[in-house]
């Protein structure tokens, strides 16, 4: 049940009041089946032993890579952009020169994996630190999703302005409901773009246009004292790979090259902003 489509307020009581209770009850019945036996591979003691090593931390001083304690944070979630398209990771040559260049300029994590296999699961994994489940999308279960911690909620409590930008249908897989419950104060989606911008691809607004919107949004904040956290989910490297760009004959590679080109142009322009020196930019494939 995509109940997030009726969410309209930062007050979750009001959002929950807008849900049809009878419909919600019937929809929740599909989650009654239990799947524990299908994925219960190890005894509890062995599971605890395996997990213990993952949480080990070195007893050393933390090395800071920032020049401020309250930086602006721009999180760019790159649709489907795995290492197969990154040359320095052994991927296809020439597809992502911008990302290859940025990797050498910043801090590059070469052995980092998301615990998910779809964007809805990867989003929850990234913002809420909740691992993607094999048979169930937590984003589609509002009663669970709204109770999860969220980086937007934490930063909001710390005085940050929080917002989310996506050029597609933000109601898909109940994304709107999850994001609003998670503390994102403003959402921008395909509904906030003209029909002309939306008509190029059936999946939504192409990345060159959404990156321009992102740049305009950030420019409006120049001079404001309140720090901000902006999350941006790209779109064009998703099938059907319809992009206003021609570098490769292969549509798949060409779409990824287009997103990379958009990222490179955005970074080039944002470097000119007075906010550049006080902004942490994180790029992560979904």
Identify what each model region corresponds to.
Residues 2-285:
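Soluble catalytic regions of membrane-associated enzymes that act on cell-envelope
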